């Protein structure tokens, strides 16, 4: 079995789309029975006492909530936003609700939301 260096793995992951990476993480979690999310207790311990002032978010996740009647236009919009292939974009749209973009800048997230809504989809920014 071939062994890959950390640099080779990072290079391979760098070429993947966010949707492909998300699918990989899910498969990794299932195969090795682990969870990629940080433990909740560690987050709670970081904020003792009074709640900190709420910061303005600078990264957003664009979530495709519902497709609507214009499925083909939504698939085209997803392809334009994510650079996914036709099959991957269709799978993402068919699996709604699903994230289309993750950790996107506010400007990019709002632009993607507008494109998807124009195509007939229902979209949330988280």
Swiss-Prot record:
SUPFAM superfamilies in the cross-refs: ClpS-like, Ribosomal protein L7/12, oligomerisation (N-terminal) domain
Known function: Forms part of the ribosomal stalk which helps the ribosome interact with GTP-bound translation factors. Is thus essential for accurate translation.
Residue segments, region Disordered: 104-126
Gene Ontology molecular function: mRNA binding; structural constituent of ribosome
Signal peptide: none
Protein family per UniProt: Belongs to the bacterial ribosomal protein bL12 family.
Oligomer and partners: Homodimer. Part of the ribosomal stalk of the 50S ribosomal subunit. Forms a multimeric L10(L12)X complex, where L10 forms an elongated spine to which 2 to 4 L12 dimers bind in a sequential fashion. Binds GTP-bound translation factors.
Keywords: Ribonucleoprotein, Ribosomal protein
Gene coding for it: rplL
Record GO biological process: translation
CC per GO annotation: cytosolic large ribosomal subunit
Protein name: Large ribosomal subunit protein bL12
Composition skew (Low complexity), residue ranges: 117-126
Annotated Basic and acidic residues bias: 104-116
Lineage: Bacteria, Bacillati, Actinomycetota, Actinomycetes, Bifidobacteriales
Database matches in Pfam families: Ribosomal_L12, Ribosomal_L12_N
